[in-house]
C-alpha cells in the first residue's frame, strides 16, 4: 500500500486543531486506496490537553519527547511521500523542519503547504519542498498526481 505522511504543526494547537485537517486528508486519500499516516494516531487522550506543548507530554510513551521523535522519524522513513502542512503557523516549527530534512536525506518526495508570510519561510524549507502549494486541496491533488498511474 502507498502511504503518505501527514506532517504539520502540532505545538501551540489544540488536539482538534492539529488533527482535523489530517482526518480530512485521510478520508480523501483512502478513497484512492492510499493510506494517510498521521502522527496524531492513537493520541486521542491529548484532547484533554488545552494546548499541545513542543516538549510533548510525559503521560504516555507515544507523547514523551523520545516517543514523538522516534515514531515520527519511523513514519517519515516508511512512508512513500511527505505532505507537510505549515498553514497558519504562528512560529517556526523545529519538528516540521526535522521531518523535511529526514525526507530530503531519504529522497522522499515532499509537498509543503505554506502561505506567503508564514514564519517557516526559510531557504531550508523552500529547498526541501519538491512541491510548494497553498491549500490542502492542492496538496492532495498533487499527491494523487504523483502516486497514481
Residue positions per predicted region:
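Conserved catalytic or regulatory cores that recognize and/or transform ribose-phosphate-containing ligands
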Residues: 1-149
